[in-house]
Amino acid sequence: ILKDNEKNLIAQIANDNSEGQIVLSGKIEDLDKLIIILKENAIKNIKLPVSAPFHCSLMSKATSIMKEELDKINFKQGNNKLISNVTANEILDFNEIKDLLIKQIENRVRWRESVINMINNDVNHFIEIGPGKVLSGLVKRINREVKIDTINNQVDIEGLKI
């Protein structure tokens, strides 16, 4: 779409949530221009109320701050497998964690690929912790066969059966 329109927009994919759902991030004025282009091409879009251009290059100042803070922390090897939302792969080298956390600020969240990777590696039960069911809904869009639980309060925790 953009090849025939403005090519210098700062609008980047921030989240690849599921088939047919991506989130864009960038300069407000550029996103507003992109919304017009999408509407002209009959592409459904919703402008989300967010406070910053998360997961895009405009977050470079926050990346620097995060790096300084993470450099003060000594991480220890954990017992559980971790999937990076930056790579959508399992983190095999424990020393990569800090770098991946830093990269996550300016790079897209590869949620769809992360979930597919987990399912392909025999994860069949997802638990969403916190208010709402947004992530559970995204997982269902990716694969309806997995078990999904949501934890919103103490009662939910007590009723959880793993």
What are these regions (language model features)?
Residues N143-R144:
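Expand to "…catalyze enediolate/carbanion chemistry for C-C bond making/breaking, isomerization
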Residues I1-K140, D149-I162:
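Acyltransferase
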